[in-house]
From Swiss-Prot:
Organism domain of life: Bacteria
Lineage: Bacteria, Pseudomonadati, Pseudomonadota, Gammaproteobacteria, Thiotrichales
Gene encoding the protein: folE2
Family of the protein in this entry: Belongs to the GTP cyclohydrolase IV family.
The keyword Hydrolase belongs to this UniProt entry's keyword annotation: yes
Descriptive protein name: GTP cyclohydrolase FolE2
Presence of keyword Hydrolase: yes
Cross-referenced Gene3D superfamilies: Urate Oxidase (3.10.270.10)
Organism: Hydrogenovibrio crunogenus (strain DSM 25203 / XCL-2)
Keywords, in A-Z order: Hydrolase
NCBIfam families tied to this protein: PRK13674.1-1
Amino acid sequence: MPDIACQPHQDPQGKLNWVGMSGIELPIKIEQDSQTLTLSSQVQAYVSLDDPLSKGIHMSRLYLILDEMGSNAPLNPASIQTLLTAFIESHQGLSQNAFVEFRFDYYERRRSLKSDNSGWKHYPCTLRGEMRNGQFECEISISVPYSSTCPCSAALSRQLIQEAFEQQFNGQDLDYNQVLEWLGTPEGICATPHSQRSYAQVKLKVNAEHPLNLSNVINQIEDAVKTPVQSTVKREDEQEFARLNATNLMFCEDAARRLQAKLESCPEYKDYWVRVNHLESLHPHDAVAIVTKNVPGGYSDEPNFMERFQN
């Protein structure tokens, strides 16, 4: 059968940075503790077209390599490196560089704060790999929701409570039980600080030997911010959630610095990029802070916007 992709190209001639496919629907395998999950993903796959005389690449070869990997090998940095090597080998004489990206939704059961319950939580994830001039790079991206309570609003609320107390008991001699009883009334908490669902968007550069453990990445992020959103909640869980928010008041700057400190303590990450988004309940806009590891040739500090963080 004729294959015009193998015929020489005439005019105009030129090399192309990337040629390939996007929106590929592919089941993938992700290892989670002692089990292997099968998840649906959307994939981009590309190779460079380095021969200006070639009409094009062989897209079916990329697809077949992807299909074989998705059916057999769990997705991790090592398997992505193997995949990219196979992309380039399948285009000998045409391509020196390769790129792949997997976007998927990772679900995990997370325990409630106090009660003996657990529930599903959803984390949008992306795994990217690139082989350029023989050098391999791999990136893990994840979006983790948490709660943030405004320190300024908390201080203003405390002031109103103090004023209400003074107005109610001005000049009176009080005993312990009177104060305790008043604190349990609606008037005892006449103002509450505003809080909001917030998102930590994190990109991590890892080596090929890095064992992909998304649960560990989630734990590191949630341990840093201290206020992860909850799925299954009983009254004791909601009360503990309120306590955690009160003891972890955060501007977006505070959340970014907490994540910075956590990731700096993790030698397994060659580089990181963090964007925290506080979806303000007080304002119609978001409060945002961005931090990178600032390694030479590493992530840019451009405030680009990761997609799907509100999913």
